[in-house]
Amino acid sequence: MNGNKDAIFKALGDSTRRLILDELSERNELTLYELTIRLITKYDLSITRQAIAKHLSVLEDAGLVTSKRKGKYRVLIFNNEPLKNLLKGWIE
């Protein structure tokens, strides 16, 4: 679990990744294109889809983002279970 904790804290340690999680938690399912457009327009970020894909890789390694195929698109989904499990020991 320590490795997973480290991965979660690493993922949360970057402000862009936190914005990605904010958007995914707000909208539930987004494609990479939709996520990119939201980040650029809502937060005035200067970021490419490739850079977001790298951030998503870190979030996926931590278990905070999953994806599934919907037709020809890959949809991104926020998974808050790792955060709940991490905090459970401290809060209870």
UniProtKB/Swiss-Prot annotation:
DNA-binding region listed in the record: 37-61
Every HTH arsR-type domain range: 1-92
Protein name per UniProt: Uncharacterized HTH-type transcriptional regulator YuzN
UniProt xrefs under Pfam families: HTH_20 (PF12840)
Keywords tagged on the record: DNA-binding, Transcription, Transcription regulation
GO aspect biological process, one term: regulation of DNA-templated transcription
Gene3D superfamilies xrefs: Winged helix-like DNA-binding domain superfamily/Winged helix DNA-binding domain (1.10.10.10)
Gene: yuzN
